[in-house]
Amino acid sequence: MAINFPEGTQDLPSKIVQVVQATYTGSSTHASSSFTDTGIQVSITPKSSSSKVLIMTSFLFGQTKSVNAVQDNMKYFTLFRGSTNIAPGNTRFFAHQNESGTSANFDEQTQVASITYLDSPATTSSTTYKLRCSSDNPSQVTISINRRGIADNTGSSTMIAMEVET
């Protein structure tokens, strides 16, 4: 879904040029120490190479843990523009770790998270933003998107790209 704003309809220092939203209703699982696509993504074609693109994503995730442990493994989430990690320092936007529990406890949990980032893609070509995830110990933890670790889909995730003319 895209919303376009005709020139001159806003009298602000910055103008919203267009808004694109994508909703991911499927589910996916990830067991990798490298960042892998979650299926949550949005594409936008900026009208000006000087525009900024505000990316907002809200997503659900769970996990399956293969062993009981006092402390959980780390799960990492970041945004990519094409093949480029756009997190500060090319690292990640956030890491998540539950404090304690059994593998059964971890399998039952669902978390909701969000990332918001103002990007400067400097292009007028179609640009795809993707949410990717990884973990510090993929042999012990599998990240699930839009579901608990042991259940079917429990919801949907969205990503919005908003072109802002500055």
Task: Show the residue positions of the predicted features.
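Glycine-rich, low-complexity segments
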Residues: 1-27, 166
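Terminal beta-strand-rich extracellular "head" domains
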Residues: 23-24, 29-34, 46-126, 130-166
